[in-house]
Amino acid sequence: MHLPPADVRPNALILSYPVITAGEFAHRGSFRSLTGTDDIAAHQPHSLENLVTPDTPPTFLWHTWTDGAVPVENTLLMAMALHKAGVPAEVHVFPRGGHGVALGNQVTNIPGEEARKIVPEATVWTEMAARFIRQIFTKS
């Protein structure tokens, strides 16, 4: 079954500690998995901050400053690209928390990783994202 791109385009995005860039702050393992190669030149066409257009859906992004897996610069680069393209966006960077914080509470905690995964200040991201989505789709 083939659907036109407009029929499968998301209406909005929620990106949590996302892998965005194939550049200096890349998470190389993700690009290796995506492309099947370690060739950095093959990664570049997939660098999302370079693919943002005014048609990119409104985007909510969040990250933690201390994410040791995916550098926070990924979120910051995407935020700048969205701003430059005039795409509505909301961005939050919480001061601490490792990669995969998820809900930041006991519900999504991995036993033994409480210091990295229990991040009370980040638990509000779901409420913030819901408010952003409501604002995008509420007619004024």
Where is each model-derived feature located?
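C-terminal catalytic histidine-bearing segment of alpha/beta-hydrolase fold enzymes
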Residues: E73-S140
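Short beta-strand/loop motif that positions the catalytic acidic residue
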Residues: D55, F60-H63, D67
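Primarily recognizes the serine-hydrolase "nucleophile elbow" in alpha/beta-hydrolase
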Residues: M1-S30, D39-Q44, L48, Q135
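Conserved serine/cysteine hydrolase catalytic core
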Residues: L48-T56
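Loop/turn elements at helix/coil->beta-strand transitions in domains of secreted/extracellular proteins
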Residues: R9-A12, T56-T59, A85-E90
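Active-site-proximal beta-strand/loop segments in catalytic clefts of secreted hydrolases
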Residues: S16-V19, H63-W65, F94-G97
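Acidic catalytic loop of the alpha/beta-hydrolase fold
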Residues: A22, T66-V70
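Residues at alpha-helix caps and immediate loop-helix transition turns in enzyme cores, especially N-
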Residues: A26, P71-N74
